[in-house]
């Protein structure tokens, strides 16, 4: 299942997409500040969403002030 990830700072979206790719995610930009993400290492959509939320929050800790919204 693909999830949509919207970032408040479009200049950092490429960096986040690269970080996601290093973790085995497939991500493609669908708007200047939005990407579609698939995490194939999970069994369910709920598991994928939880894993991605955890990863994005950890990434945000190194990027104060950047907001990220994950949705289906």
Q: Where are the language model's segments positioned?
A:
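Structural motif
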Residues: 7-9, 40-41
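Intrinsic disorder/low-complexity detector
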Residues: 8, 14, 18, 67-72
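Short amphipathic alpha-helical segments
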Residues: 8, 12, 48-51
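C-terminal basic regulatory modules in eukaryotic proteins
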Residues: 39-72
């Amino acid at each position: 299942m693909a999830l949509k990830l919207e970032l408040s700072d479009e200049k950092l979206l490429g960096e986040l997409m690269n970080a996601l790719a290093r973790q085995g995610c497939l991500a493609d930009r669908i708007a200047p500040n939005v990407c579609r993400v698939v995490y194939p290492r999970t069994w369910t959509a709920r598991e994928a969403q939880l894993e991605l939320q955890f990863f994005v929050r950890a990434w945000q800790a190194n990027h104060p002030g950047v907001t990220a919204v994950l949705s289906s």
